[in-house]
């Protein structure tokens, strides 16, 4: 009970073998699910080799599910009213609002979800993992050396969406 989280519904685990490289995904809406590609992980651009890939992937993806599914009284009220956790559909733009009301934490910035999951996977591996990688240390040391600006979470989100990538 690390998270103090009571799941709204069961978490479905789908193991698949349709690719030549390992990966995983998680969702908290319309249901709790984890999908794991069982092929070996590609370590080409990684900063560490996981001791046991299913342990690492399960910790990482279950953190995503817990963060997206966690609920309070207001969320529970909307979930009961809407009959569950609606998934946003392109054909029904209003479903974006219903999804936000029932599962607001699904819509947090990606850096928050990924940062939390990477921290937890590293913690569960006894301090070995991507949260302690040399790459991150190099980036922060370079930023200090270059007197680069460290953004606050709000400033980072604002700056990140202000640039036109097209």
Residue ranges and their predicted role:
Residues 1-102, 109, 158-164:
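Juxtacatalytic substrate-recognition/specificity segment
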């Amino acid at each position: 009970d690390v998270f103090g989280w009571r799941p709204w519904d069961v978490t479905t685990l789908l193991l698949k073998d349709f690719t030549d490289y390992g990966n995983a995904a998680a969702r908290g809406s319309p249901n709790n699910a984890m999908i794991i590609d069982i092929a070996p992980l590609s370590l080409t651009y990684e900063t560490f080799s996981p001791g046991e890939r299913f342990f690492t992937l399960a910790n990482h993806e279950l953190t995503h599910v817990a963060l997206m599914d966690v609920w309070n009284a207001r969320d529970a009220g909307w979930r009961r009213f809407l009959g569950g956790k609606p998934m946003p559909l392109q054909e029904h733009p209003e479903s974006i609002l219903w999804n936000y009301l029932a599962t607001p934490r699904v819509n947090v910035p990606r850096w928050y979800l990924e940062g939390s999951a990477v921290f937890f996977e590293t913690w569960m591996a006894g301090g070995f993992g991507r949260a302690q990688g040399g790459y991150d240390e190099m980036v922060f040391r370079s930023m200090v050396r270059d007197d680069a600006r460290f953004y606050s979470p709000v400033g980072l989100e604002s700056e990140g969406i202000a640039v036109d990538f097209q």
